[in-house]
Amino acid sequence: MTADIGATLNRNSWLKDSIVKIRGKQVILAGDVGGTKCNLALFSEKGGTLIPVFKQRFASKEFAQFDLIVKEFSRQAADHLGSERIIAAGFGIAGPVINGRVRATNLPWVVETETLIRELAVPNVVLLNDLGATGHSLEHLPPEDFCVLNPGVPEAGGTRALLAAGTGLGQSILVWDGGRYRVVPSEGGHSDFAPHTEQQIELLRFMRRRYPQVSWELILSGRGFRTIHEFLAPNVKHASFEDPDADPAPEITRRGLDKSCRVCADTLDLWTAIYGAEAGNLAL
C-alpha cells in the first residue's frame, strides 16, 4: 500500500513539482495508515519514478497518536537517510479528510497536516482518504498486481469502484472526466446492512442484539469473521477466541480454507457472499 501512496504522490500537483526537483540527497515519505497497522516508506527518484529506499511497519494500537509513529519512524530512518532530507510527505488514512484534518476510523487518533509539518520539518504534507489514495494508484500498478475474478472487457473511461475489507470497510469511486479519473472517497461502509437471504436476516437479528446500528463494515471487516462464527456456532470456540486482544480472523480463514473446521468454512462462505453483495451494490 505504501507503493500505492507513492504512486498517488505523482498525481498531486505540488508533489509532482517536488518529485521533479528530487536529487540524490532528497526523499519523499509515504504512508498507509490503517486501524491495525501503519506502513511507512521513504522514496527516492530514479528515472522519473519513485523507488522505496526504507520501509517499516508499526502496530497502530501500540501508539496513542500517529505523530508518535512518525517520530519513531524518523528515528529508525536516520541511519538510512544520512545527509538526505525529506522534502514532502503523503499519507493515506482510513477516515474522511476535511481541511487537512482526519479523525481516524477505528482508532482514537486525530491526524492534522500542521502537526506533521512541524514533526517532520517539511513544507508539504498531504492527507488522503486511504481508498482515495488507492484509487489514484490504479493507473500506475503493473498488470501482475491485478487478479481477474470474472473475465471481461473493461469499458474505456468507465466508472470504477473500489472495495477493501480490513479493520474496517473502505470504499471509493473513480469517475472519468474526459481527461483523467477523478477519485470520489466514500464512507459507504457505514451504511446499513441489507440482508438478502433468510440466513442473513437471522444474522442481522443476531447482530441487532449487540449493536444499535448494523453497518456493512461490522460484518465485512476482520471482526466480522468472529461475529459470523459466533452466529453460526455460539458454543464453538478456538484458541484465538480466548484472548480478548487477539484477532481470530486469520485462524478462521486458515481453518476454513483447509477445511479443518466446518464452522470456519461456513463462516468464509457467508462472509464472501455478503462481500459479493456489497460489491454489487457499490457497482450500481
Predicted segment positions?
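A glycine- and small-aliphatic-rich helix-loop capping segment at beta-alpha/alpha-beta transitions
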Residues: 45-49, 105-110, 141-149, 176-184
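Conserved phosphate-binding catalytic cores of ATP/NTP-utilizing and phosphoryl-transfer enzymes
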Residues: 8-23, 126-160
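Glycine-rich phosphate-binding loop plus the immediately following alpha-helix
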Residues: 131, 161, 167-237
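Short beta-strand-loop/turn "lid" adjacent to the catalytic site in phosphate-handling enzymes
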Residues: 79-127, 132-145, 162
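Generic detection of short hydrophobic beta-strand segments and adjacent strand-loop junctions
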Residues: 56-58, 148, 191
